[in-house]
A protein has these predicted regions:
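Claisen-condensing/thiolase-fold acyl-transfer catalytic domains that form or cleave C-C bonds
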Residues: 1-150
C-alpha cells in the first residue's frame, strides 16, 4: 500500500483560442465521467470495479486509441483491476509517473493523474490519454478523464 503524503496540484483550464495562446499544443478534455458503486462491501465482487468500467465507457474510452494511462490505484491489485476494467491493451503505457503507488497525495491524486497525462500531451509525448481518480478503500468512486492533443 502506498504511503500517504502531503502535496498539491494546480491545473489551468482554458477554452479555444485562450488555451492555444497559453501553449502550443493544449491537452483537450474530450470526455469525463464519475460513477459510484455501493459502499456496502458484501453486495459486489471486490475483484471488479463496475463504476470504473462505466465511467470509462461514458468518458469515451476506446482501448485501441489510448497511448497512456495514469491510474490512481493505491495497491498493485487495484491497478490490475482498473487496467482490466478500462480495457487497456498491451501497448498502452501505464503510470509512467510512478502513479499513486509511489506516493498517494490523497485528495490531490486524481488531479495529479490528470496533470501527468496533460503534461505528456502538451510535450508531444502522447496524443490521447486516460486519467483516473478513485476514492474509497475498494474502488467505490471512480472518475475517468480522456485528454487529447491536436
Amino acid at each position: 500500500i502506498s504511503e500517504i503524503a502531503d502535496g498539491g496540484c494546480a491545473v489551468i483550464l482554458a477554452a479555444g483560442d485562450k488555451a492555444r495562446s497559453l501553449c502550443e499544443r493544449p491537452a483537450w478534455i474530450k470526455g469525463i465521467d464519475h460513477r459510484v458503486d455501493s459502499h456496502t462491501l458484501g453486495v459486489r465482487d471486490l475483484t471488479r470495479a463496475p463504476s470504473a468500467f462505466l465511467a470509462a465507457e461514458k468518458a469515451g474510452v476506446s482501448n485501441d486509441r489510448i497511448d497512456l494511462a495514469e491510474i490512481h490505484g493505491i495497491t498493485s491489485a487495484q491497478e490490475s483491476i482498473l487496467e482490466k476494467e478500462f480495457g487497456l491493451n498491451e501497448e498502452t503505457l501505464v503510470n509512467l509517473s510512478g502513479g499513486s503507488l509511489a506516493s498517494d497525495t490523497m485528495m490531490a491524486s486524481g488531479l495529479i493523474r490528470i496533470s501527468e497525462v496533460a503534461s505528456r500531451i502538451i510535450s508531444d509525448q502522447a496524443d490521447r490519454g486516460l486519467a483516473h481518480a478513485t476514492s474509497g478503500p475498494c474502488l467505490q468512486q471512480n472518475l475517468v478523464c480522456i485528454l487529447e492533443g491536436e
